[in-house]
From Swiss-Prot:
PANTHER family: UBIQUITIN-CONJUGATING ENZYME E2 (PTHR24067)
Transmembrane stretches, start-end: none
Gene3D superfamilies registered for this protein in UniProt: Ubiquitin Conjugating Enzyme
Protein name: Protein crossbronx
Domain (UBC core): residue spans on this chain: 20-176
Family that this chain belongs to: Belongs to the ubiquitin-conjugating enzyme family. FTS subfamily.
GO BP term (any one): defense response to bacterium
Protein source organism: Drosophila yakuba (Fruit fly)
InterPro entries referenced in this protein's UniProt entry, alphabetically: Ub_conjugating_enzyme, UBQ-conjugat_E2_core, UBQ-conjugating_enzyme/RWD
Top-level taxon of the source organism: Eukaryota
Length: 244
């Protein structure tokens, strides 16, 4: 009987800890929403809140017009653990801070360790934006051999034209696969469809008329109260239809 009670207490404690963690992760997502980050979209997986799906749209600098998908993996004890979240791109991305083998982004230069209550995911995403906006500035003051991709760093410093050519190759490859079948059946995976006038035209017109926010509740109601991971891009372009 005593063993059964101990097991029940442990289960209850684990459940409470899990619920508390879920609330903390939800709070992180709400903070990201309130920051209104431009050109970057993320959403937690439907089945695992420790895995997030994201897409980065380059809007300036060398990476302008890039469309890079990435995944964020949160530590098991996030945000209480000092371990850092992991950002992994789904394709080749040449950048001094991106490992050419694992496609993982090194965030340790900005976040030596995760400080619960001080560091937040929106700051991590702002850092991602910053290093792509100005890659040269992002490596200033850092020894080349301490960067994830020292070859990319050397190229950026000594042969910018070749570096830009490789970036353009990455951008083309990312665009070529933007409409690929999703690698997962997770309903929160961010999906892009080619523009269809009969399906997406009315939405585009509402956005142009500035009525998208007013119609949002009815759209969610039609989906059973849940927003979907679906997005649309205009034909011939690789920009999501949004108010921005």
């Amino acid at each position: 009987m005593t063993l059964d009670l101990d097991a029940t207490k442990k289960d209850d404690k684990l459940l409470i800890t899990t619920i508390q963690q879920e609330y903390k992760i939800l709070a992180e997502y709400k903070m990201i929403e309130s920051e209104k980050l431009s050109g970057i979209y993320v959403i937690p997986s439907y089945v695992n809140s420790l895995q997030w799906f994201g897409v980065f749209f380059g809007r300036q600098g060398l990476y302008m017009e890039s469309v890079f998908r990435f995944t964020i993996l949160l530590p098991d004890r996030f945000p209480d653990d000092k371990s850092l979240p992991t950002i992994i791109f789904q394709q080749d991305v040449i950048h001094p801070h991106v490992c050419p083998y694992t496609h993982s982004l090194d965030v340790s230069h900005a976040f030596p360790e995760w400080r619960c209550g001080e560091d937040h995911l929106w700051q991590l995403l702002k850092y991602l934006q910053a290093i792509f906006s100005d890659p040269l500035d992002s490596i200033r003051g850092i020894e080349v051999d301490k960067l994830k991709n020292s070859e990319a760093a050397e190229l950026l410093i000594t042969n910018k034209e070749e570096y830009m050519a490789r970036v353009q190759k990455n951008i083309k490859e990312s665009k070529d696969h933007i409409f690929d079948t999703p690698p997962t059946e997770d309903p929160h995976y961010i999906v892009f469809e080619k523009f269809q006038q009969d399906v997406h035209g009315p939405v585009l017109e509402r956005i142009k008329a500035g009525r998208s926010k007013q119609t949002e509740p009815s759209v969610q109601q039609a989906n059973g109260g849940h927003a979907t991971g679906l997005s649309w891009v205009k034909e011939g372009e690789f920009k999501p239809l949004s108010i921005e």
